[in-house]
Curated annotation (Swiss-Prot):
This is Trimethylamine monooxygenase. Its EC number is 1.14.13.148. It holds the Pfam family FMO-like. It comes from Pelagibacter ubique (strain HTCC1002). One of its GO terms (molecular function) is flavin adenine dinucleotide binding. Keywords: FAD, Flavoprotein, Monooxygenase, NADP, Oxidoreductase. Belongs to the FMO family. Catalyzes the oxidation of trimethylamine (TMA) to produce trimethylamine N-oxide (TMAO). In vitro, has a broad substrate specificity, oxidizing many nitrogen- and sulfur-containing compounds, including dimethylamine (DMA), dimethylsulfide (DMS) and dimethylsulfoxide (DMSO). The keyword Transmembrane helix does not apply. The gene is tmm.
Length: 443
């Protein structure tokens, strides 16, 4: 029997497991599936941990979630086509839920089946190599410190790319008397109440960590950008300045001449695509971009069609895009989709990369990824979902942020699956200090 290894049981890995489960429910004979995950439970990044640094077994903690995290994009844009929010919660819910609510939704879909039995938890994959038409996967049982090997016909890498932080060095860091941390280790904005905070970065992490610090009482928040400012209308106590040059004592000196006394520096400087367990000839090497190179349809490894990577893109679309990728990967593995010859694959990859290189703004990026996801959707039997409505919702969301970065989470949108419109949340985001599922749903 064909054997498939799935590495990671976060959203991408769960999409892969779900895709095979659905095929089996449809009466198809599926391969033997083994999923590996280094954590104690499923959910990937959404499985919040208080830990930073190392876990109890000495491995790096993969989690980057923090307390009081609320979705920074409309939930409707990530809705599963085969499992709506309405079905899970029994009613429409507001469009911007906190982490616990989304985690509950993610698990609700996979708990319906017997998927957990296919996952080896507390298991770290240490090496994947390919020879004689097969993959050899070496893995370590962390609890028992036992090394094992197994042979697979296909490998799906679904580890994500938001767990290994990129940490730059600036002059003066060693002598800085305050707190320096990467957003990967950020857990609680309450730590910075009454303090002056410098946040370095200009993408979603910088935006949200800065807003969290402001919301929970930071004295001031100064955001340092390298290339282009986010440019939002920040509330009093927040500002953007150009590029940190150095730290001198407790002062942050920026290249535009701005000087800011600070108690803490939070590096929101992104993450690395990091696959130390993959042999060199199988390893994806890319920055954070909408169409990584070497991946046919953004999924199949160009040099070995038995290897797939899920969720490696910079992302507007998330969960339903991961599903479309997983359904596509499944159908390649099960022979329902035939990969073309090398020349056609090269041509297809170059087409998407060329289009990506011409993108100039967020609206164009949304269009690009929507068209990519729609194309994948049409290639499999993934259930119907309104990607045109998702496109429209993304663009409205972007414009709401430009209008008011503090209130965009108070808007509501329609589901691309059921059409129901989420109610306005009972408490404006800026005033909502309790992020529990119970309070969110029932107050």
């Amino acid at each position: 029997m064909t054997k498939v290894a799935i590495i990671g049981a976060g959203p991408c890995g769960l999409s892969a497991l779900r895709s095979f489960e659905q095929a089996e429910k449809n009466g198809e004979k599926i391969p033997e599936i083994v999923c590996f995950d280094k954590q104690e439970d499923w959910g990937g990044l959404w499985n919040y941990s208080w830990r930073t640094g190392s876990d109890q077994y000495g491995d790096p903690v993969p989690n980057s979630m923090y307390r009081y995290l609320w979705s920074n994009g409309p939930k409707e844009c990530l809705e599963f086509a085969d499992y709506s929010f309405d079905e899970h919660f029994g009613k429409p819910i507001p469009s911007f839920p906190p982490r616990e609510v989304l985690y509950n939704y993610i698990l609700g879909r996979v708990k319906k089946g017997n998927l957990k039995s296919k996952i080896k938890f507390n298991t770290t994959v240490t090496n994947v190599s390919y020879d004689n038409e097969n993959f050899e996967v070496t893995y370590r049982d962390k609890k028992n410190d036992k090394i094992s090997k197994d042979i697979f016909d296909y490998v799906i890498v679904s580890t994500g790319h938001f767990s290994v932080p990129f940490i730059p060095e600036y002059p003066g860091m060693k002598a800085f008397p305050g707190r320096i941390m990467h957003s990967h280790d950020f857990r609680d904005a309450e730590e910075f109440r009454g303090k002056n905070v410098v946040v370095l970065g200009s993408s979603y992490s910088a935006e949200d960590v800065a807003l969290q610090c402001h919301k929970y009482g930071a004295k001031s928040v100064t955001i340092g950008y390298r290339h282009n400012p986010m440019g939002f209308k920040w509330p009093e106590g927040m500002k953007e300045v150009f590029h940190l040059d150095r730290l001198e004592g407790n002062k942050a000196i920026f290249k535009d001449g701005h000087v800011q006394e600070t108690d803490a520096v939070i590096l929101c400087t992104g993450y690395l695509h990091h696959f130390p367990f993959m042999s060199e000839d199988l390893k994806l090497k890319t920055g954070n971009r909408l169409y990584p190179p070497m991946l046919y349809k953004g999924v199949v490894w160009q040099n070995n069609h038995k290897l797939m990577y899920l969720g490696m893109q910079d992302q507007f679309h998330t969960f339903n895009m991961f599903d479309c990728q997983a359904w596509f990967a499944r159908d390649v593995i099960m022979g329902k989709i035939k990969t073309p010859n090398d020349s056609e694959i090269e041509k297809d990859i170059n087409k998407w990369v060329s289009m990506e290189e011409k993108l100039e703004n967020a609206d164009q990026m949304i269009d690009f990824q929507t068209e990519y996801t729609k194309e994948l959707h049409e290639l499999s039997d993934y259930p119907k979902i309104d990607f045109e409505l998702i496109r429209k919702t993304f663009k409205e969301w972007e414009h709401h942020k430009v209008e008011n970065i503090m209130t965009y989470r108070n808007k509501s949108f329609a589901s691309p699956v059921t059409g129901s419109v989420g109610p306005i949340h009972h408490t404006p985001w800026e005033e909502a200090m309790d992020d529990s599922l119970k309070t969110f749903l029932n107050k």
